[in-house]
């Protein structure tokens, strides 16, 4: 029988070869790995994302707000290619220290607001524009329950 004692290393080292092609997307790194300034457009909302299920949620919300006539929901969408590591660039990490898409920079106020995680962005937009989030307690609880379920 072999020795079953496990001693964790003093410093964890990420094994770049482990996990295949997609392992690097969620690698355990804190902070940026490269300098990269994010583009900024002319609209109040700057969305940094990709067409993944979580990435698309915010785009759908912004489009629905625009359809309701909320011009403050105009946005510029910028591609964050998670396959090439864009999410680890300094500009993106400044908005989302967890290096995950989507991330939103709301520049509609004098001090820009960074919002990350799809659910947090959806709640921010719903509260900001007074749409899609009920105020009646039972309806709000049901809405938030479904929102949290999808994350």
Name each model-derived stretch:
Residues 1-151:
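GST-like domain detector, emphasizing the conserved glutathione-binding G-site
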